[in-house]
């Protein structure tokens, strides 16, 4: 147990030590200040502005929103066509045919929205061109869009009596050039050094060391080893909280995540930028205490989730504990729940990844969440159901938590009978309506989607498990879509018209509705003047506010999802211990 605590602590300490300086760097990128990469990248940046005709025009929130939607729509059309037509396009050594219309729609919606839900297996259903030119490019762009919207919101707090929130095209260009590309290059090289594949070779057939005899008597003497440009996609899928694996089993695949060191790199990359953005927020609003307060709230929720998942998976189930074949060589010490986990990562590496990937809207996996204990699986589900605000996706996680902060100061204002304020700006009914829209988009979409799927005979027949766990598989799928996460309980037959279309629509809804509402809040705040701090102003940087913020986040999650969780993982847990 002490070794496990040491590992958990080490992961978290490294994360904090990396996030603080990166947050300062991102703040400089946002403000177009000089950074150490400026001499190298500035000529490329200016060339892009010149070729595309991008100027320094300040956009109001409506124009910024239109730019976000128009850019995403163009990306949607391109990626949808690429999925349909990949069979007649180059860089397809395996001759993989185009995807069906519904799978193409689902995949396109998934990657445009930074969700990366995968109803396909990459090595058998997508060509190198689609993976590289389609999915990898969208991993960069969708992450950049989320961070750009956060930048606009920060400007809404810092600017006074204005209407402009910055220029979307300049924000997006700088985020990709100065942040996402450099980090991805470094991580890609490190992953290749560990054995992650990066090539354009055809798949290779290799002889097995020991042949396999099937039940029907046939003998298998060889296997197909997939190839491809995986490392470059894996790097940005982690850094951009995208999560879609190059291979079907994601980062549980030995060619995508070969070693314990690659596992550490990929795992830290999940939360690196979301955590750093908290410090960017504090720096750029010129009050670092505010950024630290939000970081501590997120970090506290992450630690609670990590502890519950870790203890649950380490203890296993009563059935495993009674089985003398699963132990670590010590008397009466269970080996934990190793079902669905890679032995090279173990319970600690798998539990940490599960907490990180569902706290962020990443969704990549190095173990199968469907095989987690009921409580461990429930916590991963709840992290998504909270709206992906425990760090969450790059950009969108922080602006989601800021929406909760606005609700928190409003509730506190009602308690003391004062007009609520946040960061020197008055919070009025318009901001509250938009904040509630941000916070309610996720639970509404999850619950409606899960309810419709639960009464669909086609979906029920596709489940590999019945009863409480079968319902959990449905609830997890729609929680993943509603949280823009992308991970799954794998027992659900995902590649059906109903699942592809319904989940695709939910992903689009929960991505763009909160995004536009966030820009609307920014557009309202930027026009307001700063309010002087008074005796009655609620401090939003102390432990009291942090506690209130955590309480509000958990309250919304508990009230919204407890009935559904009671029918799924909680019922399964009670059945298990009965």
From Swiss-Prot:
Pfam families xrefs: KdpA (PF03814)
Membrane topology: Multi-pass membrane protein
Keywords, sorted A to Z: Cell membrane, Ion transport, Membrane, Potassium, Potassium transport, Transmembrane, Transmembrane helix, Transport
GO MF annotation list: P-type potassium transmembrane transporter activity; potassium ion binding
One cellular component (GO) term of this entry: plasma membrane
Protein family according to the UniProt entry: Belongs to the KdpA family.
HAMAP family attached to this UniProt entry: KdpA
Protein name, entry field: Potassium-transporting ATPase potassium-binding subunit
Lineage, opening ranks: Bacteria, Bacillati, Bacillota, Clostridia, Eubacteriales
Gene name as annotated: kdpA
């Amino acid at each position: 147990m002490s070794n496990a605590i040491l590992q958990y602590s080490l992961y978290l300490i490294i994360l904090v030590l990396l996030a603080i300086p990166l947050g300062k760097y991102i703040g400089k990128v946002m403000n177009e200040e000089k950074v150490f990469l400026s001499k190298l990248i500035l000529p490329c940046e200016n060339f892009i502005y010149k070729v595309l005709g991008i100027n320094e025009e300040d956009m109001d929130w409506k124009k910024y929103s239109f730019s976000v939607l128009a850019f995403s729509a163009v990306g949607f059309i391109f990626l949808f066509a690429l999925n349909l037509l990949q069979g007649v396009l180059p860089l397809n050594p395996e001759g993989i045919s185009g995807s069906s219309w519904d799978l193409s729609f689902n995949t396109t919606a998934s990657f445009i929205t930074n969700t990366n839900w995968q109803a396909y297996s990459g090595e058998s259903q997508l060509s190198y061109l689609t993976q590289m030119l389609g999915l990898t490019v969208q991993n960069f762009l969708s992450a950049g869009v989320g961070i750009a919207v956060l930048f606009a919101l920060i400007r809404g707090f810092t600017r006074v009596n204005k209407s402009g929130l910055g220029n979307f095209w300049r924000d997006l260009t700088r985020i990709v050039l100065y942040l996402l590309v450099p980090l991805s290059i470094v991580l890609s090289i490190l992953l290749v050094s560990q054995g992650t594949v990066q090539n354009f070779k055809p798949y290779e057939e290799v002889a097995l060391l020991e042949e396999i005899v099937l039940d029907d008597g046939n003998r298998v003497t060889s296997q197909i080893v997939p190839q491809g440009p995986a490392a470059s996609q894996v790097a940005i899928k982690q850094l951009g909280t995208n999560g879609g694996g190059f291979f079907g089993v994601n980062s549980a695949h030995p060619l995508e995540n070969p070693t314990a060191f690659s596992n550490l790199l990929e795992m830290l990359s999940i939360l690196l930028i979301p955590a750093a953005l908290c410090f960017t927020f504090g720096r750029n609003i010129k009050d670092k205490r505010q950024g630290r307060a939000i970081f501590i709230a997120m970090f506290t929720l992450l630690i609670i989730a990590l502890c519950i998942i870790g203890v649950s998976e380490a203890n296993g189930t009563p059935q495993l504990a009674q089985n003398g074949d699963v132990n670590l060589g010590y008397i009466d010490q269970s080996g934990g729940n190793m079902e669905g986990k890679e032995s090279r990562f173990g319970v600690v590496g798998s539990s940490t990844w599960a907490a990180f990937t569902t706290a962020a809207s990443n969704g990549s996996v190095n173990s199968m969440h469907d095989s987690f204990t009921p409580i461990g699986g429930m916590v991963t589900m709840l992290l998504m159901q909270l709206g992906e605000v425990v760090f969450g996706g790059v950009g969108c996680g922080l602006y989601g938590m800021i929406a909760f902060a606005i609700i928190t100061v409003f509730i506190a204002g009602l308690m003391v009978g004062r007009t609520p304020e946040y960061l020197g700006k008055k919070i009025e009914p318009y901001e509250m309506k938009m904040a509630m829209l941000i916070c309610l988009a996720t639970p509404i979409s999850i619950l409606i989607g899960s309810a419709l799927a639960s009464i669909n005979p086609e979906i029920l027949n596709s489940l590999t498990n019945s009863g409480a766990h079968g319902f959990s598989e449905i609830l997890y799928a729609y929680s993943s879509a509603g949280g823009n996460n992308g991970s799954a309980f794998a027992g659900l037959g995902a590649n059906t018209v109903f699942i592809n279309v319904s989940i695709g629509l939910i992903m689009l809804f929960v991505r763009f509705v909160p995004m536009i509402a966030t820009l609307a809040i920014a557009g309202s705040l930027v026009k307001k003047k700063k309010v002087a701090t008074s005796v009655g102003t609620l401090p939003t940087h102390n432990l009291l506010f942090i506690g209130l913020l955590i309480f509000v986040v958990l309250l919304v999650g508990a009230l919204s999802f407890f009935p559904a969780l009671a029918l799924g993982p909680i019922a399964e847990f009670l059945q298990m211990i009965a």
